[in-house]
Amino acid sequence: MSRKQLALFEPVLLVQALTDAVKKLSPRAQWRNPVMFVVWAGSVLTTLLTLAMVTGQIAGSALFTGVISLWLWFTVLFANFAEALAEGRSKAQANSLKGVKKTAFARRLRAPRHDAQADNVPAAELRKGDIVLVKAGDIIPCDGEVIEGGASVDESAITGESAPVIRESGGDFASVTGGTRILSDWLVIACSVNPGETFLDRMIAMVEGAQRRKTPNEIALTILLIALTIVFLLATATLWPFSAWGGNAVSVTVLVALLVCLIPTTIGGLLSAIGVAGMSRMLGANVIATSGRAVEAAGDVDVLLLDKTGTITLGNRQASDFIPARGVDERTLADAAQLASLADETPEGRSIVILAKQRFNLRERDVQSLHATFVPFTAQSRMSGINIDNRMIRKGSVDAIRRHVESNGGHFPADVEQNVENVARLGATPLVVVEGARVLGVIALKDIVKGGIKERFAQLRKMGIKTVMITGDNRLTAAAIAAEAGVDDFLAEATPEAKLALIRQYQAEGRLVAMTGDGTNDAPALAQADVAVAMNSGTQAAKEAGNMVDLDSNPTKLIEVVHIGKQMLMTRGSLTTFSIANDVAKYFAIIPAAFAATYPQLNALNVMGLHSPNSAILSAVIFNALIIIFLIPLALKGVSYKPLSASAMLRRNLWIYGLGGLVVPFIGIKVIDVLLTLLGLA
């Protein structure tokens, strides 16, 4: 990935965020955040009181009320600034994507073939189902599927990756994205979306936050914050008659200051910024999430379904050996295996052709001159091969070949069964080759487990996350690789139906499941999973079924996605703990100052030794505003994340953010009080 990363406090973003923060002072914008709306209402009320005192309409200290009013406005402004800065970072990322969208013309074909007559039309007029021809140097005008041709495509504008990729008809690499550029050859593309619905349009909308809705956890936390605000509002309202009855009524300004300091303004002011920043961090990892709900779900995941190839292993399985059946010589097996692999463009297929050439000098045959029919691999048949003259050669998984042999009246030899087990026990993948109903032998495909993957799985296990390896290999091979990699469980000989059933089984147990996929056959399982990361190189069906798209098409990214989700939840929880713990210190500052004249016994609570009642109240209000500014970097970057169990994580957060939330305000309020006294403002 080479996408430019934004600095946390980019000067241009700071200026724009300040402007947006002022715009957000409107009551319509404030109403979306009930906690900060109360602060906004208090700011308006104290401003009106200040004006009334200045004009002599009511008695009171206009200077004290005015300063309190000013810092209440700063509190609202700082909360707006945090949200605007988070949104500004997202909008900056979106603007880089908007630069990809270019007004262009498209060659709309009148028939679905490359030599059909074409009409030049604006790309904006293309509709779902239209067929277009795109040549070298052209911008692909729409999202779609390649139905003819093959070409190298520059997707750097979307993925940030400079290396071109191959897109061709058929298979799992037929999906193309509007806004990318053809570097060579040509493609005939069937548009799969209408204008405004392209992947790029959806990316921009998601990144800008225009479609951001509150997640379930955000809603639950907002309800808690509203409940606390109502409780403190009622408690504060009852204090006026108590103080009046005592003969020294507390001023409205002091009551407003008390209310603002007691309600959870810190988390209330940063909550929206945390959610926006979580989406932004996900994009920083080159993953597009369809919603904050998907990011949040990633933090709650406790089961990871991981494809073996490319995620757990390096994914470049190579043919290492030909093991013939009894009565078959190795050259005959190698010749049949090479024939069955001539049209197989997978790394495994090409390695079989090369191994046969190296071992027995078997040259690749001219495919056209063979007049053969090639049988492609499918997830259902789990085998591929060739029909040539009267020969029917197949290679595939053990079970698939066994069914094929038995359906043709043959018998699966015991010695081949033993060879399959021997290969599987070594952690290699056995492919069986058959001609007609006669089993010729086994091809061994070796793969290598990625370095450090076992340690990563151990960390996930410590966090309470179960890892399940998904593979098309037989049980013996799967068990050997699972043991080497250190996963908790595995699903061998996996079919799309088996994946879907496994996800439903875990969900029935109340667990949240995450998985990756890139093919059309993965779409049902992706749609069922709670967190479904589709590969950008995959099919349109897979991308539509998932709730995230990995622009790097790296299956290992699923682990990073879970880390980002957990970091967002931890950030929200940690700052909530800090915010509520803050109230205790502010209680010790304001209560004695506000009511000591009525109830002198309350002076015992002035443990900080604050200079005067006015300086105590003002210090608490100033600290309440400034702490939001100091916590903005933490809200945007997220708290430090370490793979720990839930109980260990809770203890750690209580010590750091609970105890910190108690201690920091005592120190901060006292320092501000001393400064106010030195400046003669106390």
Curated annotation (Swiss-Prot):
Keywords (A to Z) from UniProt: ATP-binding, Cell inner membrane, Cell membrane, Ion transport, Magnesium, Membrane, Metal-binding, Nucleotide-binding, Phosphoprotein, Potassium, Potassium transport, Translocase, Transmembrane, Transmembrane helix, Transport
Binding positions for ATP per the UniProt entry: 344, 348, 377-384, 395
Transmembrane parts of this sequence: 34-54, 58-78, 219-239, 254-274, 588-608, 616-636, 662-682
Membrane topology qualifier: Multi-pass membrane protein
Pfam family, one: Hydrolase
Summary of the function given for this chain in its UniProt record: Part of the high-affinity ATP-driven potassium transport (or Kdp) system, which catalyzes the hydrolysis of ATP coupled with the electrogenic transport of potassium into the cytoplasm. This subunit is responsible for energy coupling to the transport system and for the release of the potassium ions to the cytoplasm.
Highest taxon of the lineage: Bacteria
Protein name (record): Potassium-transporting ATPase ATP-binding subunit
Subunit structure: The system is composed of three essential subunits: KdpA, KdpB and KdpC.
Main location: membrane
Record-linked CDD domains: P-type_ATPase_K
Annotated catalysed reactions: K(+)(out) + ATP + H2O = K(+)(in) + ADP + phosphate + H(+)
Family label: Belongs to the cation transport ATPase (P-type) (TC 3.A.3) family. Type IA subfamily.
Compartment annotation: Cell inner membrane
Active site: 307
GO cellular component, one term: plasma membrane
Keyword hit for Protein biosynthesis: no
Residues the record lists as binding Mg(2+): 518, 522
Classification via PROSITE patterns: ATPASE_E1_E2
EC number(s) on file: 7.2.2.6
Gene source species: Salmonella paratyphi B (strain ATCC BAA-1250 / SPB7)
GO MF terms, alphabetically ordered: ATP binding; ATP hydrolysis activity; magnesium ion binding; P-type potassium transmembrane transporter activity
